[in-house]
Amino acid sequence: MTQPLPDHGQPWNEVRARMTDMAAGDVKWRDGRAAVYVFNAGEDIDRVQKEAYALFASENGLGPAAFPSLARMEREVVGFGLGLLHAPEGAAGAMTSGGTDSILMAVKAARDFARKERGLTGRLNLVLPRSAHPAFDKACMVMEIEIRRTPLKGFLADPEAMEAAVDEATIMIVGSAPCFPFGLIDPIGALGALAERRGLWLHVDACVGGYIAPFVRMNGGDVPPFDFAVPGVSSMSADLHKYGYCAKGASTVFFRTEALRSHMPFTVSDWPAGKMTTPTLAGTRPGGAIAAAWAVMNHLGVDGYRRKHGMVTAAREQIEAGVRARGFEVIGAPQLGIVAFTHPEVDGLAILGQLYQRGWVTSAVTEPRGL
């Protein structure tokens, strides 16, 4: 459907008023009515995000030589993440536009590693638990890789089922920390042992948990090993714009070694303008997202994140207690910010519909039906 561009420009105050009117029907996330899509750390962090983003809104991360400030900020943000996730010396990574982007790049690196270093040809496959994010399906669809989802055991990845699905053409196995449907951390230690035993690339999808789990652990929470502290982990994804409280779109993808990361970039020289290399899929990379991430992380620091995530833990525990008191059953033993629950007599999807009608936005699970 076409839309005619206005013949004449309009004053900004009028355009802004129209935008505000358009948003009148949006979920009131600032009032706490959205459990997904927005990770609200409060007005102070919102202000830091916006001001930092605006300072570099026109700059482009595609040109590190032109904008060394952005290159430095990205390097430091990546370093912060590597440090929090127990990466060894020599580990590497990059910022991306979001979790799907990070996962796509990790799969691309694993595929190219399998072809160049392991000599694999023909149809390749990726093995993951049923609860893993559909971004892996998207990546495999784009790269024509067979996706093999395996049954869960107690709502967690089942290492035995995953090993049974592995063969010589497997380029990657996946664990989540936590999985999005249930908020549960897969047995990464066991998956790491499987990866080492079979010579497999293990990717840990910590898009949800990467920037909350380290601080929950610092606060005394019982968080199992899930990151590069597990020897078999080759790569990780972790979203800055979730519990890192950075502006959208900002995520990170990490690799245990520079040699593994080297399979991620794109380099093309067969055209009339010389060699072009991009570290990730994107060409233009918004400088505002890089700058806002750097600003928020420096503004909060470890103590700030511990405070914010202490509040998340308290809220999750309060929700757990509240739903249990009303006859719901909490799925598993959530340790971070997501809690899923079902009721033996009430359809969770029906509740979801009623919540939406009342201006509350959350997500559902379908196996079993719940919230």
Named regions from a protein language model:
Residues 1-90:
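N-terminal entrance/gating region of PLP-dependent enzymes' catalytic architecture
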Residues 38-41, 61-65, 89-97, 238-241, ...:
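A short glycine/serine-rich beta->alpha loop
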Residues 58-65, 88-94, 123, 147-150, ...:
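Glycine- and acidic
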Residues 69-70, 93-100, 128-129, 365-366:
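Active-site nucleophile and cofactor-binding loops and adjacent substrate-binding regions
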Residues 83, 108-112, 294-299:
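Short glycine/serine- and small hydrophobic-enriched flexible loop segments
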Residues 97-268, 272-275:
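Conserved PLP-enzyme active-site core in the AAT-like
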Residues 218-335, 342-344:
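Active-site C-terminal subdomain of aminotransferase-like
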Residues 327-359, 365:
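Conserved PLP-binding catalytic core of the aspartate aminotransferase-like
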